[in-house]
Amino acid sequence: MPSSSERQRALAEFVVRLRRGLADSLVDVRLFGSEARGEASPESDIDVLIVVQPDDARIALEDRIIDIAFDVNVEFGVYISPRVVTPGILNHPVWGATPFLSNVRRESLPL
């Protein structure tokens, strides 16, 4: 099982690869869940919210993000769990107000 420092290195590498691979499409990257709250165990997944643009490219960008997460997961022995949204989803009166996104807004940390 990866140590806390290995998990942090994996997360940092994931963010570097996102920035390199998505460039101008990447709007924001935020850590949430047990890792952000300081409650993670070595078996916990690492929840990451990734905001991309444009809205109509989300599916294609999500595929790339999943590939990046997979590579980092295999290399570091962690489980990064990406959740991909767009500004349109975040600002939508219904989708943006879901309990999930409300919790992410409240507890997330910028990466």
Predicted segments with their positions:
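Catalytic core of pol beta-like nucleotidyltransferases
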Residues: 1-28, 37-42, 53-111
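Basic/aromatic recognition patch in beta-strand/loop cores that engages polyanionic ligands
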Residues: 34
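Short beta-strand->loop micro-motif that forms the acidic, two-metal-ion catalytic signature
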Residues: 47-51
